[in-house]
């Protein structure tokens, strides 16, 4: 039976690194964040943390915190028929419930957990969209308070702690993927 796994965690925890390991093993990636960037382009907004946050929140401001799951549900369904699917940037509890209701036990959540000081340090030095400590803290608060991010993290089926080396983390992610 094919699987759908959403990789969740706070910004800077290592979600993208984990998702890359799924892709290397033939999983189809569906990136919810793509909808944010498409909308930003439509609005003529520069890609930066402030505009990303405003756009994410605007898309959900209609009162539909499950909007990203609804946007991508047809692609998830089609991809699932063909093979395994990994979802990146599923944030909200509403998104989780929509996907869980549709796919049941075929859907799981993998949470990448990293201590906040380690995440903030990594975010300062990452090459793609680095964040200051202030911006990182602001994003944490915004995602927890405004987009229900804690739900999927709290109910995850499996957790991987990413406080150590890249090598150790990748090994644990690979072991998890291979167990599926």
Regions found by a protein language model. Give the residues of each.
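ATP-dependent small-molecule kinase phosphotransfer cores
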Residues: 28-86, 90-98, 129, 134-135
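Hydrophobic positions on the alpha1 helix immediately C-terminal to the Walker A/P-loop
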Residues: 18
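P-loop (Walker A) phosphate-binding loop of NTP-binding proteins
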Residues: 10, 22
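Small-molecule kinase domains that catalyze NTP-dependent phosphoryl transfer to phosphate-bearing small molecules
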Residues: 66, 124-179
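Conserved phosphate-donor/acceptor-positioning beta-strand/loop module used by diverse small-molecule
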Residues: 88-89, 102-127
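Short, well-ordered beta-strand core segments
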Residues: 29, 108-109, 158-161
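Conserved lysine of the Walker
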Residues: 15
């Amino acid at each position: 039976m094919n699987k759908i796994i959403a990789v969740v965690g706070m910004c800077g925890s290592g979600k993208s690194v984990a998702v890359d390991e799924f892709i290397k093993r033939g999983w189809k990636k569906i990136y919810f964040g793509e909808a944010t960037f498409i909308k930003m382009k439509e609005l003529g907004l520069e890609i930066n943390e402030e505009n990303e946050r405003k756009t994410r929140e605007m898309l959900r401001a209609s009162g539909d915190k499950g909007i990203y799951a609804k946007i991508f549900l047809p692609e998830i369904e089609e991809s699932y028929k063909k093979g395994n699917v990994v979802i990146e940037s599923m944030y909200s509890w509403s998104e989780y419930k929509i996907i869980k209701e549709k796919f049941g036990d075929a859907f799981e959540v993998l949470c990448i957990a990293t201590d906040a000081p380690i995440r903030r340090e990594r975010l300062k030095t990452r090459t793609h969209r680095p964040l200051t400590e202030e911006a990182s803290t602001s994003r944490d608060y915004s995602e927890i308070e405004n987009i229900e991010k804690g739900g999927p993290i709290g109910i995850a089926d499996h957790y991987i702690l990413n406080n150590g080396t890249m090598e150790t983390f990748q090994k644990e992610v690979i072991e998890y993927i291979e167990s599926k």
